[in-house]
Each structure stands twice: as C-alpha cells, then as structure tokens.
Amino acid sequence: MGVRFCKDGHVIQIIIENKEEVTMKKMKEQQKKREKTKNGRRVIAAKKIQAWWRGTLVRRTLLHAALSTWIIQSWWRLTKDRLLQKKRRAALSDYALRERAVVKLQSLVRMWRIHWRYCQVLNAIYVIQCHWQCHNCQTCALLRGHCVVTATHLQFHIEIINP
C-alpha cells in the first residue's frame, strides 16, 4: 500500500496494492526471464552440439578422403614398381641373350681360327712326309718334331736325329 502526495497539495493519489498480485507478477516475470535464459542456454547448447557434429562430419569426410587417397597412391606405387620390375627383367633377359650370342659367336670364330691353323699344320706335315718319303736317305736319320699352336702364330720344331 502506498500513498502519494503532490507538492501542490491538490491531488492526492492513493494506491493500494495487493501483495499477492505483485508477487504473482514478479514471479511471472522471473519465470519468463528464466524461460528466456533457459531457452537461450538451450539454443547456445544446441548450437554447440550442432557445431561439434558438423566438425565431426567434416573430419570423418576428410579422413575418408585421406584414406582413399592413401589407398590409391599405394596401389599406384605398387603398379609402378611391378612395371619397373618387369622392365628390369626384360632388360636383363635381353642382355643375357645378347651376351650368350656374343660368347657363342666368339667361340665359333676361335674354333674356326684354330681349325684353320690345325689344317695348315696338317697340310705342312703332309708336305713334309711326302717329301721325306720321296727322299731316299742313306743314313736313315730319324725325324723328331713337334708343333705348338698359339693364339697368334704357329711354331714348328723339327729335329733330325742320326743313330
């Protein structure tokens, strides 16, 4: 309850307040404020939860993309390595084949040269034998000889031995 007076003294206003109504109004206002703060807190909490969830989804998507990239890169490295190994094996096989061919050709050339020298020695021996058989030696000397074939030339050693 309250009484108010004007300074002039003309008007007197008397206000009688019901305490129950005032307390009810105050309680309603406080409840509205609480609801607003609760709703505000809820909105803030909901925003935080939504932000966390969006972040989780983004991280999950990025992780999935990174794993997919890693898998593709690993596959590509493996494929490149297999191709490189295949090329190396093919190059090694070609090299070995060429080396075998060269070695075989060299051995055939060496064999041909040695055979040619052998044929020369054989022809020389035939010539010497033929001349020796045609020659009538009265002392009947013996011939002892040997032949050495080297890579570059041919050596004969013939000894005539008188008994």
UniProtKB/Swiss-Prot annotation:
* Database matches in InterPro entries: IQ_motif_EF-hand-BS (IPR000048), IQCF (IPR039887)
Q: Which domain of life is it from?
A: Eukaryota
Question: What high-level taxonomic lineage is stated for the organism?
Answer: Eukaryota, Metazoa, Chordata, Craniata, Vertebrata
Provide the species name: Bos taurus
- Domain IQ: where? 42-71, 98-127
Coiled-coil parts of chain: none
What is this protein's name?
IQ domain-containing protein F2
**PROSITE patterns for the chain:** IQ
Q: Which GO terms describe its molecular function?
A: calmodulin binding
Keywords assigned by UniProt, alphabetized: Repeat
